[in-house]
Amino acid sequence: MVFYKYSGSGNDFLIVQSFKKKDFSNLAKQVCHRHEGFGADGLVVVLPSKDYDYEWDFYNSDGSKAGMCGNASRCVGLFAYQHAIASKNHVFLAGKREISICIEEPNIIESNLGNYKILDTIPALRCEKFFTNDSVLENIPTFYLIDTGVPHLVGFVKNKEWLNSLNTLELRALRHAFNANINIAFIENKETIFLQTYERGVEDFTLACGTGMAAVFIAARIFYNTPEKAALIPKSSESLELSLKNDEIFYKGAVRYIGMSVLGMSVFENGCF
């Protein structure tokens, strides 16, 4: 079994083709492990589709499945083109979402995430029990729960430096309380937003999260009147351009091919596949 590793906005993914739909949870846990596997934020299984160029199953590094991953969508789009699975402009199925891909330059990929849902606005009072004394999060008056393929809780701080002082235990508590990824952001100007994401399935801060950046972008647009196009800068410092067109979210940014890995028979013998 051959795995291809791609990176987008600081997220890295292993991509593999399969001609049959199976449960790849155990395989994902093993191959995504940073010390005992190849190391990745997630595993993308590319599957044949009757109605689309292809479809995928996406697994987090802990083996859990997710319906959508924004940066992985751009990575798999480039993979599909480079491996003659699809043309430069194509559409694939991610869970129940149709994702359109446009390859504008050799490694600049735009993907259409589709629409979003504002699930709830949450006053800080509902979250105070999760905060420690002198918590940075106490300065956030309102949190926003937004579905961009997966649920995200978004809050904005007034000081960029506070992004470096976030408490992992607090974010973990919020993640379990709302069953959502947690994003804390700072609007530097109307067109530049910095953020940190605590991600489900990874259970820690990640260098980037595409659907998290989308949720922050939407919250900033709706509640802080930012423009319909902005640069989102995650922990990796790899900027991603997000835009809103006809109420749908578009990502645009660079994707890098890292390399190829081959799975040995030992994994099969251990029952991981």
UniProtKB/Swiss-Prot annotation:
List of residues binding substrate: 11, 60, 70-71, 181, 199-200, 210-211
Enzyme class: isomerase
Pathway: Amino-acid biosynthesis; L-lysine biosynthesis via DAP pathway; DL-2,6-diaminopimelate from LL-2,6-diaminopimelate: step 1/1
Pfam entry (one): DAP_epimerase
Active site: 69 (proton donor), 209 (proton acceptor)
Sample GO molecular function, one term: diaminopimelate epimerase activity
Gene Ontology cellular-component terms listed: cytosol
Location in the cell: Cytoplasm
Keywords: Amino-acid biosynthesis, Cytoplasm, Isomerase, Lysine biosynthesis
SUPFAM superfamilies: Diaminopimelate epimerase-like
Family: Belongs to the diaminopimelate epimerase family.
Function (record text): Catalyzes the stereoinversion of LL-2,6-diaminopimelate (L,L-DAP) to meso-diaminopimelate (meso-DAP), a precursor of L-lysine and an essential component of the bacterial peptidoglycan.
Protein name as annotated: Diaminopimelate epimerase
Protein encoded by which gene: dapF
